[in-house]
Amino acid sequence: MTDARGTPLGAATDAAGVSETMLGPAALADIPPCVALPPMVPVVADRAYDSDPLRGHLAGRGFRLLSPHRRGRVRPATNDGRRMRRYRRRYVVERTFAWLHGYRRVVTRFERMAELHHGFVHLALAFICLNRLL
């Protein structure tokens, strides 16, 4: 989870087989309470996050999910073109992932314990935040 400039706010890690929609609420819960977010902040995500339960969970926490709909969507579309213009700024999140992949220990998971890997991810994100500040 990043802000509009690409500064990391929170992260969630899990096994490779877990759906990304399950990690979204965990990444939001990882944002520290000292970060002041305005109400109804848009969360820009890719097509994998398009699920109605996740939209409901985010709306309950004061966020609005902006993601393109999946092709086989059964329910009617909830996005319009005006709000989806913000999806163009998705490159900011992808750029933060590229910065994170600059840390070899995070890219290849050498640790067997999930807590250690999660700690190294947070350490790499802290270094990214320091580089953004300096």
Language model features with spans:
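Short, acidic, Ser/Thr-enriched surface-loop or helix-capping motifs
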Residues: D3
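Active-site beta-loop-alpha junctions of metal-dependent nucleic acid enzymes
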Residues: A12-V35
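Helix-centered, glycine/charged polyanion-binding patches within enzymatic domains
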Residues: G17, P33, L37-M113
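Catalytic-loop motifs flanking and including active-site residues across diverse enzymes
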Residues: E20-L23, V92, G119-H122
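Charged phosphate-binding loop/patch that engages nucleotide di/tri-phosphates or the phosphate backbone
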Residues: F120-L134
